[in-house]
């Protein structure tokens, strides 16, 4: 039996992607480190109409021998050491010209390293992130490939068939560029995901602090969803999480430890943004907000050692309906904050493209987020259109200036209310407001003073607005 493509790793993502591809009519060879898992997979799907398109192999040698040449293998194992180990095993059984595709959440620089190592061995490589989770892998995820165009063209028919389709029928995949471009896009996709999930978490915290129960919070979010602007997968899962009940009928949120895990992509994105000098405070604070949660013991000790230090007057809504004035303020705040997060994310990608020469087509990349992935939602369509209309737009927020003008005062008022009346931490909502304010301020006065401060103590010099070059002031000696 000559198989079209191989899948290595039958965890949740690998198993579901293998089923997805097989259902599209391709013959899929599967291999797992433990053959018992492969047997379980085959048994569980023996009655599927496309079961004849699946075949499991006990050894890597048999797996490789089953594949049509040039062989194509999708690697779906844990990023890092497991990926390196799997790659080394495949190198031993694959031949010159064969293709390895790493789909893990890898750092884009690691993908560049793997590509060089494999090319030196005569193999071809593609880094291709996947978004959409278990359901996406099975029904159609978004893919983010990067590497050599000729390699992409060989794997393209399989990937496009398996990908989610947007409303216009276009598959949610595009070749993002050379080297680690695909993994870089996936990194910033995940950083945007971090930030927007955190915004919804902060909204939940705010509304609960204002006296709403979980079902009332969910009702507010349902109303916001009906307005379409915020309609998204992340809003849907926020509503589901708020409504979820434990076995005893109580809200599940009340039994969940407030520690948020992470896989590292958000941190990598924040680090890269800082290194290349792109302001991305919401993406950075989304990482910090998770770090806050990991300090559970310290937070408990602080609250015990200094009781009441964050005590505030409190604020209970008189009108808990979605039409209430404070809820309208919060709605406007969230709309602008999410626009701000996307603006930062895309600005990072634009600058990363300049630094690393990926050859990124940003409108095409954004279009791949419209379905199948965690970021999917209404806003991706007008954002794609904004970049298609003006690829050189100074900042995505300019395309949404009508919404920002209409809601910015409400945003400011809401942040003021939260910080003065509620014991609620809002790291990303506050960072997003600061980003909007800073990026629309032609002259930042603090920039003038701090430039002079640096000249006083370090003779670093400063630029003037009335002539080119740098100069230093003759400062009097300070005691």
From Swiss-Prot:
Pathway: Carbohydrate degradation; pentose phosphate pathway; D-ribulose 5-phosphate from D-glucose 6-phosphate (oxidative stage): step 3/3
Catalytic machinery residues: 186 (proton acceptor), 193 (proton donor)
UniProt-annotated binding residues for substrate: 105, 131-133, 189-190, 194, 263, 290, 454, 460
Amino-acid positions noted as binding NADP(+) in the UniProt annotation, renumbered to this chain: 9-14, 32-34, 77-79, 105
Disulfide bonds: none
Gene Ontology MF, one: NADP binding
InterPro entries documented for this protein: 6-PGluconate_DH-like_C_sf, 6PGD_dom2, 6PGDH_C, 6PGDH_Gnd/GntZ, 6PGDH_NADP-bd, 6PGdom_BS, NAD(P)-bd_dom_sf, Pgluconate_DH
Keywords for the protein's UniProt record, in alphabetical order: Gluconate utilization, NADP, Oxidoreductase, Pentose shunt
Domain of life: Eukaryota
GO cellular component, one term: cytoplasm
Catalytic activity of the protein: 6-phospho-D-gluconate + NADP(+) = D-ribulose 5-phosphate + CO2 + NADPH
Keyword NADP annotated: yes
Entry's EC annotation: 1.1.1.44
Enzyme class of the recorded protein, top EC level: oxidoreductase
Coiled-coil annotated residue ranges, if any: none
Function field: Catalyzes the oxidative decarboxylation of 6-phosphogluconate to ribulose 5-phosphate and CO(2), with concomitant reduction of NADP to NADPH.
Family: Belongs to the 6-phosphogluconate dehydrogenase family.
Subunit structure comment from the entry: Homodimer.
The protein's name: 6-phosphogluconate dehydrogenase, decarboxylating
Organism: Trypanosoma brucei brucei
Gene that specifies this protein: GND
